[in-house]
């Protein structure tokens, strides 16, 4: 109940981007989910239509993250793959990604969809690189920070994990 009240209050401010996992997107649209609280057992594919509906209802971008990310403004839809299997095992990575999205939005206010895509792509690339270095969740967290620090613009230009979806 508290979480739903908090979401309602936040949505009243008309955010430019909603960054959430699939279970959270399902809850925001009032659809049943297989997750409870932060348990993200609903897959991105299961919640794709809910994300599009939420983006259309709120006139914003929805960045639904999970094993596969779906980014939509209600009209244009993108799928991003990458990252690493350790990412869901590290607490606060979703919050960190939300902060990264906010930073990218602040730097590129005129193009919020591009800013959101770039933020998620950076996180995905850094997660993949961190996973190659880490031996577990603790070392992954540190390796992720180092990988984010080491990213260059060229790293984004070679991104092949981003797919434009014509229908979801």
Task: Identify the role of each PLM range.
Residues 48, 80-91:
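Short pre-catalytic strand/loop immediately N-terminal to key active-site residues, enriched for Gly-Thr
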Residues 27, 89-122:
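Short, small-residue alpha-helix embedded
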Residues 125-168:
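Charged C-terminal helix
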Residues 4, 45-48, 95, 109, ...:
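Electropositive phosphate-/nucleotide-binding environments in soluble metabolic enzymes
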Residues 4-77:
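Conserved phosphate/ATP/ADP-binding segment of small-molecule kinases
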Residues 50-55, 112-127, 144-145:
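Short, well-structured alpha-helical segments that form the helix of a local strand-helix-strand
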């Amino acid at each position: 109940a508290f979480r739903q009240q908090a979401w309602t209050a936040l949505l009243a401010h008309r955010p430019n981007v909603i960054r959430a996992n699939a279970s959270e997107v399902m809850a925001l649209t009032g659809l049943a989910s297989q997750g409870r609280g932060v348990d993200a057992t609903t897959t991105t594919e299961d919640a794709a239509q809910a994300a599009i509906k939420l983006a259309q209802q709120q006139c914003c971008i929805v960045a639904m993250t999970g094993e596969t990310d779906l980014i939509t403004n209600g009209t244009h839809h993108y799928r991003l793959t990458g990252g690493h299997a350790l990412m869901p095992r590290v607490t606060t990575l979703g919050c960190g990604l939300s902060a990264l999205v906010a930073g990218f939005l602040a730097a590129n206010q005129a193009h919020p969809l591009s800013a959101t895509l770039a933020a998620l792509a950076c996180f995905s690339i850094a997660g993949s690189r961190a996973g190659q270095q880490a031996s577990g969740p603790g070392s992954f967290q540190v390796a992720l920070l180092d990988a984010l620090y080491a990213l260059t613009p060229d790293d984004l230009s070679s991104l092949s994990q981003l797919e434009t979806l014509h229908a979801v």
